[in-house]
């Protein structure tokens, strides 16, 4: 395509103007017609960082290479040490943006200029100095960052009037053919999106149907198609309390006292817990390093509100358990389920005696029902006692599994007869920033040793519904597990970290990628390995499943922007998995939006260039 652009360079030229009307307006294009500038539409927009606070394109700067292709840079905000960079062959299709990092704390007013077959990006610092970074021909890799002196003319812009408003940008000349190509694309996109602008007000006219409709139906039985027996599956995403408070049968909220403001604004270790006196939280002698907070209680009533209340059903049994730290003292507790009006729905005594953390349990049988019950814990003796991992499960879970799933919800899923189950996300898989990438190995083992985390959807993950429970559920309903893990990058909508870096945050540092690749390979060993020879497989066996789960599929990446940072890490992971486990079928991704998005185009282009990396890809709509 580049050669074609050069070959028509001698044809008639048209003046066009590139500009951004406001930080959220993206890069737009106008054309000079009859001595007036007319806006054609938006060419691309920023995909950096969180929705609302970010996604801004400030001071866009373009240059055209000798081969007719285009390079674009822009400022992201006034606080990040990054700039946006993209590439286009025809002004219509733009490659997914990269966000190179600069040496200082801020990157202001970047401009791009050709430098032979490569490019230079100049930018200004907060103190007014000028620095320069080099970029390769493909505009994918950026090296060096040095202080330079630059002519102020480099930042000069053109000013034009568009419908009475003064706009600042750059004027270029392109050929008639190039301009028509852009016009055609805007027309096609307008036609494609026109149905989304339909209004119910127009339905009476548009949907008018005559009283009699004649139609002919032709059946061609010889043209039947074979339908895949694995076509229909389900996608479990931990969003809107789908796990804790949802499919996972645990009835106690914040059972681990690990809620923090990272989970949700205003939350803390005592959220969902109540007492007549302030609840004391300690960390000096934790149940497990991954679960450092616990409650210290005196003989005062402590109660938990559950998930918008605890649904208690008459005649049903509930298993209560908690870990107790009493320093060798005997301590008895009265455990109750209490209704909205104060009625005791069920109760049982719990006797404890332990010198260190020890788990105790009892069974409660409900004598009445209430949809808004609560769990009450009453110490029977004056003593300072530590408690943690306070749990209440219905005795009846799906398939009777310990630490299992809600019987009603799980049965609905089972009745769909899905052939596969995608888990655990979604945006939760790649997480809110690098620190929040979902690590499967944090979700297996004893519950108290699992590592909780905040959820990108603004709540908490106990990890009680972890990979063991997920694989067990797939086996119970006859579905293939399709676990989805991050491809070395977090969600592109991640907020800025302490350094002001958001979005994909540069991905997991390449120096740390071998360890991350090993983590993914360990999942395959955990699922399919021999407990006699592999430690991860031994962990699976100790959890109650000595036979392999027979994992066949592995998802890598979740609707990521197909940036250079993503492609490099995705390829690294795929090559390692394919080399060590050739029978595992990898499911890749082609971005967050369907055609004609930049990520969809780049994702499919990358997939076709690397056909041996993956067995299939996920198109996100």
What are these regions (language model features)?
Residues 11-208:
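Carbohydrate-active catalytic/glycan-binding domains of CAZyme proteins
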Residues 54-58, 107-109, 212-219, 277-283, ...:
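Alpha-helical scaffolding within the catalytic cores
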Residues 61-63, 71-74, 111, 120-123, ...:
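Structural recognition of the beta-strand scaffold that forms the well-ordered cores
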Residues 196-462, 480-482, 497-511, 581-585:
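Extracellular and organelle-lumenal recognition/adhesion modules and their flexible linkers in secreted
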Residues 366, 373-381, 530, 540, ...:
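Noncatalytic carbohydrate-binding groove/subsite architecture in carbohydrate-active enzymes
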Residues 431-447, 491-539, 543, 603:
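Aromatic- and acidic-residue-enriched segments that line the glycan-binding/catalytic groove
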């Amino acid at each position: 395509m580049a050669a074609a652009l050069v070959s028509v360079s001698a044809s008639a030229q048209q003046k066009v103007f590139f500009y951004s009307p406001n930080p959220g307006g993206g890069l737009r294009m106008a054309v000079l017609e009859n001595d007036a500038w007319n806006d054609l539409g938006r060419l691309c927009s920023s995909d950096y960082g969180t929705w609302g606070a970010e996604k801004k394109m400030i001071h866009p700067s373009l240059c055209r290479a000798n081969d007719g292709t285009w390079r674009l840079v822009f400022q992201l905000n006034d606080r990040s040490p990054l700039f946006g960079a993209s590439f286009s062959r025809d002004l219509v299709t733009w490659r997914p943006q990269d966000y190179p990092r600069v040496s200082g704390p801020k990157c202001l007013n970047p401009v791009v200029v050709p430098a032979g077959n490569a490019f230079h990006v100049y930018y200004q610092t907060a103190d007014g100095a000028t620095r320069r970074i080099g970029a390769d021909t493909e505009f994918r890799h950026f090296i060096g960052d040095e202080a330079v002196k630059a002519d102020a003319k480099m930042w000069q812009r053109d000013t034009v009037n568009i419908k009475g408003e003064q706009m600042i940008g750059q004027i270029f000349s392109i050929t008639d053919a190039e301009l028509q190509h852009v016009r055609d694309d805007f027309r096609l996109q307008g036609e494609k999106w026109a149905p989304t602008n339909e209004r119910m007000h127009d339905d009476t006219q548009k949907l008018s149907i005559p009283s009699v409709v004649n139609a002919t139906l032709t059946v061609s039985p010889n043209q039947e198609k074979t339908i895949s027996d694995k076509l229909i599956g389900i996608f479990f995403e931990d969003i809107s309390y789908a796990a804790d408070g949802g499919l996972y049968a645990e009835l106690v909220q914040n059972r681990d006292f690990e809620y923090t403001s990272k989970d949700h604004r205003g939350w803390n270790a005592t959220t969902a817990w109540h007492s007549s006196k302030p609840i004391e939280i300690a960390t000096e002698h934790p149940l497990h390093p991954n679960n450092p907070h616990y409650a210290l209680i005196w003989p005062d009533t402590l109660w938990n509100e559950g998930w918008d209340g605890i649904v208690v059903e008459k005649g049903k049994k509930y298993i209560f358990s908690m870990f107790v730290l009493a320093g060798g003292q005997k301590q008895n507790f009265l455990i109750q389920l209490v209704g909205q009006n104060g009625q005791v729905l069920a109760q049982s005594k719990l006797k404890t005696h332990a010198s260190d953390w020890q788990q105790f349990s009892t069974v409660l049988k409900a004598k009445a029902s209430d949809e808004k019950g609560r769990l009450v814990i009453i110490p029977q003796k004056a003593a300072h006692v530590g408690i943690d991992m306070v749990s209440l499960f219905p005795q009846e879970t799906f398939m009777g599994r310990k630490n299992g799933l809600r019987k009603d919800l799980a049965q609905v899923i089972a009745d769909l007869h899905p052939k596969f189950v995608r888990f655990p996300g979604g945006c939760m898989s790649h997480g809110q920033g690098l620190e929040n990438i979902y690590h499967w190995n944090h979700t297996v083992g004893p519950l108290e040793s699992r590592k909780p985390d905040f959820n990108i959807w603004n709540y908490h993950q106990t990890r009680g519904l972890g990979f063991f429970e997920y694989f067990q559920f797939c086996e119970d309903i006859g579905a293939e597990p399709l676990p989805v893990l991050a491809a070395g990058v977090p969600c592109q909508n991640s907020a800025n970290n302490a350094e002001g870096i958001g979005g994909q945050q540069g991905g997991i540092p390449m120096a740390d990628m071998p360890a991350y690749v090993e983590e993914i390979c360990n999942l395959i060993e955990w699922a399919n390995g021999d407990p006699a020879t592999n430690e991860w497989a031994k962990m699976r066996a100790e959890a109650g499943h000595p036979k392999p789960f027979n994992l066949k599929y592995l998802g890598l990446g979740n609707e990521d922007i197909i940036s250079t940072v993503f492609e490099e890490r995705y390829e690294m992971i795929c090559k390692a998995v394919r080399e060590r486990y050739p029978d595992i079928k990898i499911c890749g991704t082609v971005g967050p939006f369907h055609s004609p998005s930049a990520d969809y185009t780049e994702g499919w282009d990358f997939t076709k260039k690397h056909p041996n990396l993956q067995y299939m890809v996920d198109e996100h709509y």
